[in-house]
Every structure is written in C-alpha cells, then in structure tokens.
C-alpha cells in the first residue's frame, strides 16, 4: 500500500493571469475534503459562470515542515476537467459525501487551466469569507496570497445546488436546534470550508472586520492586523497637531480582490497612515520608523513603497497644497480605471461595509446590519429582446417591471432608443398596440403643428410681443452654444434667417431645436423657456430625429424636471435639501466635512441635478445614464442616489484634500467628462439598498419602542426621518405644490 509519505513531492509555480498551479509528477495529491458547486464568475452574465470543486489535499511539506499548512493544498478544479476523468470525479464526490478526511485517495490536479489554482495553506496570507444574504445571494471567498500580495479569483458558493451543504446544514439544525453558525450567519458552504481549514492551519479572525481571517499569522502580522499600536500613534499625533485631519469611519472598508495589497487589513492601516502628509515632519518620521509601519511596508506594492519612503514626495506635499491635490487626483484616476475595467468582478467579490457597524450617533449604540442586495450591470436591451416582448398586434406581453429592470441594469442599445424612450417618457402607453400608437402619433403630430402655428404664423407676436422676443433671444443664444461638438450642431452650413441676429450662420438642426423650444414656450405658458432646457432637448432631438416626437418627449422629460426651472428655485432647493439630508443620514463624517468647508449648501451639485448630469458625462455615456433614470425602477428620484454615489466615490479626496468651498467646487467642476458611469451606477444601487435597509431598521426599532412604551412617556433617541428622504423610496412622482413644497 502506498503511504502519503511516498507520494512524489510538488514544486510550487506561479502562472500568469488567472492561474496558479503546482508541478508534481502526474499532478497527484491525496484528497481530504471536497465541495461541489463552487463557481468562478468571470463576468456579470450567469451563462459565463464556471462550476467546479473546491478541495483540501495532502502533499509533502516544502522546506520547514513545522510550518502549519505547508503540506496542505487548497485547490479549485473546474467541472470541465473532471468530466472526462470519471475515476477522479468519483473521488471528489466521495470526499464531499464523507467530508471528514477519513478517505484519502489520489486525484489529479490540472495545470494551466483558466482560473484553476492549487496553493499551500502556508502561502495564503488571509481569506475573506463573505456570507450570503437574504438566503438567496451567493456567499463568496477571496484568497489573498502572502508573498505576491495577489488575490485569487473570487469563488462563489451556489449552496442551493450543493447537496453536501444542504444536507450538512440540515444535520446542524437537527443536532443544535439552531441553523446559524458561530458568527450568527446561516450555515453556508464557506462555513463548511472554514471548519475544515481550522483542522490544518491556525486562523485568526479580525477584531475589526469579522469576515476577514489571517492564515498562520506571524506576530508581526497580528500586530499589523489588529492595528491597535498604530492607532495609538496616530491618536497621539492628532493630540500634538494643531489641525486634526479627518479620518474614515473605523469600519469603512472596501476590499477589491483585483488590486494588489488593497484587500489586506494592513492596507486599512496604511490608508490611515497615508494621511501623514497632513502632519508635521516629526510626526511623519515617527510613523515611518514605527515597528508596525515597518512590518507592513514589505507587503505593499513597490510603487507605494517608493512613494511612502520618498522624502522628496513628503516634502513636496508638505509645502504645496496643489501637490496634494495632484497626488490625490492621480490615486483617484488609478481607482477609476481599475473599477471601470473590472467593475462587476470587483463589486461582486469585495466586502462593502460602507457604514458603521456600531452607530453611536442619534441612532444610539446599536448594531446596524446592512443587507447587501446583489448588484450587477448587464447587457443593454437588444432589438431582438425588445421585439420578442410584443405580440402580433404590437402589444407588450411581458410585465412592464421586467422590461424596466432590464433597462435599469443594462441600458438600451443605441439603435433602439428611438422606439423605447417614447414609452419611458410617457409619449406612448405601455399597454398600447402598434395601431393605437400610430393613431396617437398622428394626433400628437397635429397637436404639435397647432401649437407651433400659434407663434409661427403670428407676425405681430414675433415683432411686437416683448416677452416672446426676449424668450426667442434666450433660445437663440442657448441653442448656438449647446453641444457644438456633436455632428448635428457642429457645422454652420446655412446663413442665419434673421439678418438682425448676432449669429451669422446656423444649420437645419439648430433651427429645428429653436422651433421646438419656442413651441414648448407656447405650450407651458406658466414656465416658458428657461436656460438649461436646450441642454435637455438636444439628446432627445438627436435620438428621435422627428420634430413632433422630440417635442412630446421633451414634454415628458419636463414633467419630471419641471420644478428644477421654477423662478424661485424652490425645486432645486428641494433636491439639494434631499441630497443634503441623504448625505447627513448615510455619511455623517462626509457631511461634517462639507459643513466645515462651507460646502453643505451642495452648490457643487447644482448643475448635475439641474440638467440631469448633462455636462458630467460624455454624450453616449449620458444617454445610457438617462436610460436608467427614465425607468423609475428603484426610485423616481434615483438621480439623487447617482449624485450621492459620485460624492461617495470621491469621499476620501474630499475628506483629506479639500479644506475650503472653492476647492470643493473646483474639484467637482473638474470631474466633468471624467466620470466612469458603470462603477457610479453600481455604487448608486448599493447606496440605495443601504439607505432602504437603514430606514427599515429605524422604523422597526421605532415600532418596537412604541409597542413597549404603553403610556407614551418614554423619549426616543431615534432620528426623525424627513418626508423628502422617505420620498426617495417612491417609484412614482411625489406630489408637490407649485412652489415645490410637498403637499
């Protein structure tokens, strides 16, 4: 009988891209534990998911055998590899059934397969265990390697398909009369793996982040991991400093498994430490020489090591505020590019605990548990999908909410917008047939022509009505400076029809835009034309390429944005107040900083909200954003969450690199045309669900207090939720008075 000791020994090899494997004779190892239905999610599409087996196996230790886990391999093998190896597949299945390590049989571990890996436990620095939420979202793990600082592809446990997890969970419930694990989570595949790992390695759970475990930590790792000493140093520095730099919420962390070193808790320490450029030179030197800093530095990317050790960089950032701003913008650019390229894998795999777990503000010292909804971006609605949703009479035969969900999560193919936007802008009813829409179009076309004739054929009005002349001049001026880089408006190939105009040239598209806006001025006699409307009209005009349809699309959009253009600015005040309340409710630290910099009026968001981010995103990207906003899928005022997401994605720069109103305003203005849409939308959706869950938690605690307070004498510490905030959960238009106040 062959013993484990007689097995040929593997040599570890790192493979580029997504594969880390081992080289051993015949690639044979002895299997100890196996878990099926563990998936890699290469993209956001379910069809691309790759199923496989996660396993623990035995090999001979390399080097010092006293190191725990040096002879144990953690591996992932795709099902496709085992499909043509029935004997190996049987071993994996048997190991999963027993899952107690009593059967140890040789199996083959593949080499150079995409996403497959096999690493020694002693080579793993930490593992993030992210449990499922609501009982349906997949739990996942992220494995962070010790020497390279790399993270392996995130692994997702499809527990609803895994027989061993289902059966073991039932067994635990029977034995303990409790379906939860030690951390209070429902039993899931990651819990099963954790139980097995503890047999072969020392795992230390973070006191700051319960989902993070160090594997065989050294004393230096433990010190850096807990970060207590470094926190004391930073606290002392603050006491000795004349100006206290802002710090992030203690539990705020974003783990991105595709960025080197950012995933380790040591980077959380570094993130605190990186603000030393705000301290004096003595504090910088003191931190650089601290033993905790020295223990972390070797694990960081080379670029960061050079940056932190550079006295020239430290001196430059101490002497020149613009240098701090430049470095901050550079860092933001790196993050922006990374998230733009890897938005879905990053956000599916990371740990997003963007709010305090212990809230000590007006909510009282109770635990806030945010339930993470699955957030993903998908492919845009295609022509084929759209056509398949209608019957032979051209009537929608699927649920409208389903259609809106597809658009919300992926947008619309550009060639299809002309057909879909009329539904989103309430030009056509969702339950209409093709024939009914044809009749509606003809009726709307006639109504548009009638409205246009009211001013177009009134010569007296054109030359003597002072109000009309003023409005026409405003429209003329605005149209001639709207989107002049777009091909529709770029070339002036016609002489201006009015010889008295200050503009000598024009083109047909600009003239049609003027006509539509003058007709809208006739349609909405109360509001008329207000500067900024030309910015809103241009995308609709280019998309529809039909004057009547464009006009009624503009009417639909203005029903949504009417209050933005009121003379008393009450609508804009309401929106900015809502955004202000949202920031204060969700991120008190950021709100306090905005107050400190005299920026809590949020004037930096005025343009974004006024014209629906028209100047913040490039043309094609803007249209995709409008696809999302027009759906009202999660909220009628979802643009408030988009604005909040922009603030959150840039919060660290705002907190650490801005100190006055003009700096905040300048920073936001310079974001124009540089924002990445997909990460912003993912962040906005996460923020929405966090807001919704926090609101529900407060309401639940309010109800509990009310039920327990029979005589009504007990005062509550819970915050009062403003109506503006509650309106953010509505998917239909909230009712406001003409002054913009809520009825």
From Swiss-Prot:
One GO CC annotation: nucleus
> Where's it found, cell-wise?
Cytoplasm; Nucleus
Q: Does the keyword Cytoplasm apply?
A: yes
One GO MF term on file is: GTPase activator activity
Which biological process terms from the Gene Ontology are attached to this UniProt entry? vesicle-mediated transport
Q: Rab-GAP TBC domain spans which residues?
A: 411-633
Q: Which UniProt keywords apply?
A: Cytoplasm, GTPase activation, Nucleus
Is Nucleus among this UniProt entry's keywords?
yes
- Tell me the domain of life: Eukaryota
Q: List the disulfide bonds.
A: none
Record PANTHER family: SMALL G PROTEIN SIGNALING MODULATOR 2-RELATED (PTHR22957:SF502), TBC1 DOMAIN FAMILY MEMBER GTPASE-ACTIVATING PROTEIN (PTHR22957)
What name does the UniProt record give this protein?
GTPase-activating protein gyp7
């Amino acid at each position: 009988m062959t013993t484990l000791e007689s097995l040929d020994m593997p040599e570890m090899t790192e493979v580029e891209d997504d594969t880390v494997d081992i080289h051993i004779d015949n690639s044979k190892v002895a299997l100890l534990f196996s878990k099926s239905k563990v998936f890699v999610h290469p993209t956001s599409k379910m069809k691309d998911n790759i199923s496989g087996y996660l396993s623990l196996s035995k090999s001979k230790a390399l080097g010092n055998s006293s190191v725990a886990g040096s002879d144990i391999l953690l591996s992932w093998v795709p099902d496709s590899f085992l499909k043509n190896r029935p004997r190996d597949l049987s071993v994996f299945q048997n190991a999963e059934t027993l899952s107690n390590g009593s059967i140890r049989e040789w199996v083959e571990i593949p080499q150079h397969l995409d996403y497959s890996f096999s690493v020694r436990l002693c080579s793993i620095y930490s593992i993030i265990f992210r449990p499922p939420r609501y009982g349906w979202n997949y739990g996942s793990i992220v494995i962070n390697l010790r020497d390279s600082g790399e993270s392996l592809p995130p692994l997702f446990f499809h527990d609803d398909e895994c027989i061993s997890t289902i059966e073991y969970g039932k067994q635990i419930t029977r034995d303990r009369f409790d379906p939860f694990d030690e951390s209070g989570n429902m039993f899931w595949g990651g819990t099963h793996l954790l139980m097995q790992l503890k047999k072969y390695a020392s795992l230390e759970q973070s006191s700051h982040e319960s989902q993070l475990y160090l594997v065989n930590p050294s004393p230096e790792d433990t010190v850096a991991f807990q970060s207590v000493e470094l926190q004391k140093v930073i606290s002392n520095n603050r006491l000795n400093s004349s100006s206290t730099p802002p710090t992030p919420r203690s539990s705020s962390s974003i783990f991105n498994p595709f960025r080197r070193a950012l995933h380790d808790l040591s980077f959380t320490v570094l993130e605190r430490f990186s603000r030393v450029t705000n301290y004096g030179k003595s504090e910088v030197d003191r931190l650089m020489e601290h033993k905790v800093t020295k223990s972390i530095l070797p694990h960081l990317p080379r670029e960061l090591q050079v940056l932190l050790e550079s006295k020239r960089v430290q001196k430059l950032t101490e002497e020149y505020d613009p240098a701090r701003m430049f470095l901050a913008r550079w860092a933001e650019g790196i993050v922006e590019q990374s998230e733009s390229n890897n938005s879905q894998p990053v956000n599916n795999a990371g740990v997003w605990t963007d709010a305090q777990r212990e809230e000590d503000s007006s909510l009282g010292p109770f635990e806030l548990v945010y339930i993470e909804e699955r957030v993903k971006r998908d492919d845009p609605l295609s022509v084929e999908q759209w056509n398949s949703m209608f019957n032979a009479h051209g009537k929608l035969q699927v649920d409208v909410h389903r259609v809106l969900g597809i658009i919300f999560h992926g947008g619309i193919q550009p060639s299809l917008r002309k057909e879909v936007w009329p539904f989103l802008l309430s030009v056509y009813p969702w339950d209409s047939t093709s024939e009914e829409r044809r009749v509606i179009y003809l009726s709307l076309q006639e109504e548009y022509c009638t409205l246009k004739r009211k001013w177009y054929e009134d010569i007296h009005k054109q030359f003597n009505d002072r109000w009309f002349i003023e409005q026409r001049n405003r429209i003329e001026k605005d149209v001639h400076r709207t989107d002049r880089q777009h091909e529709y408006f770029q070339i002036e190939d016609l002489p201006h029809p009015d010889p008295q105009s200050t503009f000598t040239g024009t083109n047909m598209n600009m003239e049609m835009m003027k006509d539509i806006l003058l007709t809208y001025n006739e349609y909405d006699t109360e509001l008329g034309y207000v500067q900024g409307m030309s910015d809103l009209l241009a995308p609709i005009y280019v998309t529809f390429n039909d004057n009547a349809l464009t006009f009624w699309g503009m009417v639909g959009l203005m029903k949504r944005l009417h209050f933005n253009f009121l003379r008393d600015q009450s609508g804009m005040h309401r929106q900015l107040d809502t955004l202000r309340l949202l920031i204060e409710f969700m991120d008190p630290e950021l709100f306090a900083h905005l107050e400190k910099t005299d920026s809590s009026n949020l004037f930096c968001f005025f343009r974004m909200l006024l014209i629906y981010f028209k100047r913040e995103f490039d043309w094609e990207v803007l249209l995709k954003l409008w696809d999302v906003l027009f759906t009202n899928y999660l909220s009628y005022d979802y643009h408030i969450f988009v604005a909040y997401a922009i603030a959150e994605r840039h919060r660290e720069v705002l907190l650490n690199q801005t100190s006055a109103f003009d700096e905040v305003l300048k920073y936001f203005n310079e974001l124009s045309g540089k924002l990445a849409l997909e990460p912003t939308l993912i962040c906005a959706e996460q923020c929405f669900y966090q807001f919704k869950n926090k609101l529900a938690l407060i309401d639940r605690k309010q109800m509990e207090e009310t039920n327990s307070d029979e005589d009504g004498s007990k005062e509550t510490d819970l915050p009062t939720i403003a109506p503006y905030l509650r309106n953010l959960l509505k998917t239909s238009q909230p009712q406001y008075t003409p002054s913009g106040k809520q009825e």
